[in-house]
Amino acid sequence: MPVHEIRHPLIRHKLGLMRRADISTKNFRELAQEVGALLTYEATKDLPLEQYEIPGWAGPVTVEKISGKKITVVPILRAGIGMLDGVLSLIPGAKVSAVGVARNEETLEARTYLEKLAPDIAERRSLIIDPMLATGGSMVATIDLLKKAGSKEIRAMVLVAAPEGIEAVRKAHPDVIIYTASIDEKLDENGYIIPGLGDAGDKIFGTKQKEA
């Protein structure tokens, strides 16, 4: 399973700002969107193109457009919503397929409570977005759901990933490609990524924060 850690200077700079314990909700939210957009650039750089002709100012001109399967963006609720605008700024025509997954804070097991998928998801590339890949439970549950719905080409895009989460996805779904801004050190005893970003959902939505 390919894992791409995108170490672009702009991404490294913005991710460093996001790691601050005292970051404001406004700044965290804006940076999540910006890093999401930058990761989207990398995650879509191998999309196929086809040529076509248009009328130009000096006569007909041959240009290119994306061909093949269209894309559906799959935010894992709730934190994935924080990356959505950044992703859609680059692929505004993509359909959005929302998946709600809750993690039991004691067992760390994932439970799916919502799925609103694009009706033609089997004919689309699925791009899952979530700020954190920690234990991997939510990601694996989402991929399970998408494959059951007929999705065959799936990629995952996260801001930070723990080695444990990457390994969980690799074991369950070795065909899924992961793009991340950082592979962090480890998980702590509570399942939080170290050094991580803290609770990304709380920081995006302005609710109670937990530092990790």
Swiss-Prot record:
Cofactor binding note from Swiss-Prot or TrEMBL: Binds 1 Mg(2+) ion per subunit. The magnesium is bound as Mg-PRPP.
Transmembrane segments: none
Pfam families the UniProt entry points to: UPRTase
Enzyme Commission number(s): 2.4.2.9
Matching InterPro entries: PRibTrfase_dom (IPR000836), PRTase-like (IPR029057), Upp_B (IPR034332), UPRTase/APRTase (IPR050054), Ura_phspho_trans (IPR005765)
Description of activity control: Allosterically activated by GTP.
Coiled coil residues, start to end: none
GO molecular function terms noted in the UniProt entry: GTP binding; magnesium ion binding; uracil phosphoribosyltransferase activity
GO CC list: cytoplasm; cytosol
Pathway in which the depicted protein is active: Pyrimidine metabolism; UMP biosynthesis via salvage pathway; UMP from uracil: step 1/1
Reaction catalysed by this enzyme: UMP + diphosphate = 5-phospho-alpha-D-ribose 1-diphosphate + uracil
Binding, 5-phospho-alpha-D-ribose 1-diphosphate: R78, R103, D130, P131, M132, L133, A134, T135, G136, G137, S138, D199
BP-aspect Gene Ontology terms: UMP salvage; uracil salvage
Binding site for uracil: I193, G198, D199, A200
Required cofactor(s): Mg(2+)
Keywords in alphabetical order: Allosteric enzyme, Glycosyltransferase, GTP-binding, Magnesium, Nucleotide-binding, Transferase
Family indicated by similarity: Belongs to the UPRTase family.
Function of the protein: Catalyzes the conversion of uracil and 5-phospho-alpha-D-ribose 1-diphosphate (PRPP) to UMP and diphosphate.
Protein's UniProt name: Uracil phosphoribosyltransferase
Source organism of the structure: Pseudomonas aeruginosa (strain ATCC 15692 / DSM 22644 / CIP 104116 / JCM 14847 / LMG 12228 / 1C / PRS 101 / PAO1)
Organismal lineage: Bacteria, Pseudomonadati, Pseudomonadota, Gammaproteobacteria, Pseudomonadales
Recorded name of the encoding gene: upp
